[in-house]
Regions:
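Conserved Helicase C-terminal RecA-like lobe
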Residues: 1, 18-21, 30-31, 35-45, ...
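Conserved Walker A/P-loop ATP-binding site and its immediately adjacent core
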Residues: 35, 50-72, 160-164, 325
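Conserved pre-motif I regulatory segment
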Residues: 1-25
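Conserved P-loop NTPase motor "coupling/switch" region that bridges the ATPase
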Residues: 52, 78, 97, 122, ...
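Conserved RecA-like P-loop NTPase helicase motor core
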Residues: 105, 329, 337-424, 428
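Non-catalytic, charged low-complexity extensions flanking SF2 helicase motor domains
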Residues: 405-407, 411-457
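Conserved helix-turn-beta segment of the N-terminal RecA-like "Helicase ATP-binding" lobe
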Residues: 61-86, 172-175
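Conserved helix/coil segment N-terminal to the catalytic DExD/H
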Residues: 88-120
């Protein structure tokens, strides 16, 4: 795919190239990965500034996002990569492979520093919040080898806690800007907040502390304020692809082929026609499905895992999560401290920024529902065939009065009906006929009532 950079993306890429130490403090969904990869390619093959690059990321991001982005963009052709995941032997093989870019999960940083000679002249830390605790072992171990890299890039969203910035910036510049000790940073920029006599439970920033902190790190960082003056798009639509395991995909494919999954009497998952099959396949793509008795059968947690990554990347910035099936909502609520948007009080709390993760059903997001003050990011956990409901929900945030760029994230399970739905939405063809035709195309030869066109002998 050809990459056409927005102004802010080109600005950020140039910033990385021009600054040996750099930090991109940009909201989730703005393309920090491709921004960084573009800079890495240029530093490797145009400027010959670096020869081996280490990318540290959360496990699932390391396994899927970075490799997928490298393979996705045409302008990154020629860049080799290795993913240091799996067994100790597999990780070691990847780290010693000599690839241009080696990607490792943050949980393996300590293992790497103890078992492999550190031979990287550039480090990229995707999600700096992974290193917000100076007491964490991964922070201490990376700090030891950090001076061996002549270039470093940190990627993060807008911080929800200024106290965390000390460690996050410190791992990049080795304490040059915010000081070498957390105590000095705390005394300089914070005051005790909640306390019990001599025991301080929390701190609050001093007046003007935020402006002063950002001023101190301004020479190495790009924040949302720094790119505000550029020609920023009003809305960005992203696809977050997840993949099922072979066994999970086999269940999905069997349902598509046979229209039934047998679990025992009263527990089967079945479909009687193309429309019902599309519904069941969509449920399975989301991770669970109702059996014939109305009970929920879990298939996988791939979208929940991806949502967890998005929540972490948001750094406390509110997310509005759209779901379609009741079991989607229940599974999300079981895993995350989310809250439904149902009542007037829910709407008020959302608009006041009191709900970090809010759940909403597209059918309940009618015209006149104002949610734009509470956030600017929508995550479609479940997609919908209804173009009207899709546009209607997006318009709850992407509307007059919205002060920030709107990010729309779509969770799409690879090789499933999710891809058909998103394609139909993009083409604005989400009729009942389009849904049935999509199912027919996937499984071949089905009529509307579920019978096969292939009558046989």
């Amino acid at each position: 795919m050809k990459y056409k950079a927005h102004d802010y993306q080109q600005y950020a890429t140039d910033f990385i190239i021009e600054h040996p130490v750099s930090c991109l403090i940009l909201d989730m969904g703005l393309g920090k990965t491709v921004i960084t990869l573009t800079a890495l390619w240029l530093l490797l093959f145009d400027y010959f500034e670096v020869r081996r690059i280490l990318v540290i990321a959360p496990k699932r991001v390391a396994e899927t996002t970075w490799p997928a982005e490298i393979k996705k963009w045409e302008h990154l052709y020629g860049m080799t990569f290795a993913v240091a995941m799996g067994t100790a032997g597999q990780r070691k093989e990847a780290l010693l492979s000599g690839a241009d870019v080696t990607i490792i999960g943050r949980d393996n940083v300590s293992w790497m520093t103890k078992n492999i000679f550190f031979d990287f002249d550039m480090v990229v830390i995707d999600e700096l919040s992974s290193f917000k605790s100076p007491k964490a072992q991964r922070f201490k171990d990376l700090k030891k080898v950090r001076p061996m890299a002549k270039r470093v890039v940190g990627l993060t969203g807008t911080p929800g806690n200024l106290m965390d910035l000390w460690a996050e910036i410190g791992i990049l510049d080795m304490g040059q800007r915010l000081g070498r000790y957390i105590g000095g940073y705390r005394d300089r920029f914070f005051l005790p907040d909640k306390r019990n006599r001599e025991i301080v439970f929390s701190y609050k920033p001093r007046e003007g502390a935020e402006e002063k902190i950002y001023e101190l790190i301004s020479d190495i960082s790009i924040s949302m304020k720094a790119v505000d003056y550029l020609d920023m798009p009003e809305c960005i639509s992203n696809r977050v692809t997840v993949s099922m395991s072979e066994s999970e995909q086999a269940l999905y494919d069997r349902m598509a082929d046979e229209m039934i999954l047998e679990y025992g009497e009263g527990q089967d998952i079945d479909a009687v026609n193309a429309a019902a099959l599309s519904n069941k396949l969509q449920q399975m793509a989301n991770g669970a499905a109702y059996d014939e008795s109305g009970n929920v059968r879990n298939i996988h947690d791939r979208k929940l895992d991806a949502l967890e990554d998005l929540i972490e990347s948001a750094n406390g910035k509110p997310l509005l999560v759209a779901y379609w099936f009741k079991h989607d909502r229940e599974r999300i609520l079981k895993r995350f401290p989310a809250r439904n948007i149902n009542t007037k009080k829910d709407i008020e709390d959302w608009n006041e920024g009191k709900i970090p993760v809010a759940l909403i059903h597209p059918a309940s997001a009618g015209h006149g529902l104002n949610l734009q003050e509470g956030g600017s990011t929508i995550v479609w956990f479940s997609l919908t065939w209804s173009l009207e409901l899709y546009q209607q929900l997006n318009a709850r945030l992407y509307r007059q009065g919205q002060k920030h760029m709107v990010i729309i994230e779509h969770l799409v399970t690879d090789g499933t009906v999710d891809e058909d739905i998103l394609r139909a939405i993009e083409k604005k063809d989400t009729t009942q006929n389009a849904m049935i035709e999509a199912v027919k195309a996937r499984i071949g030869g089905m009529t509307d009532d579920g019978r096969s066109n292939d009558e046989g002998i």
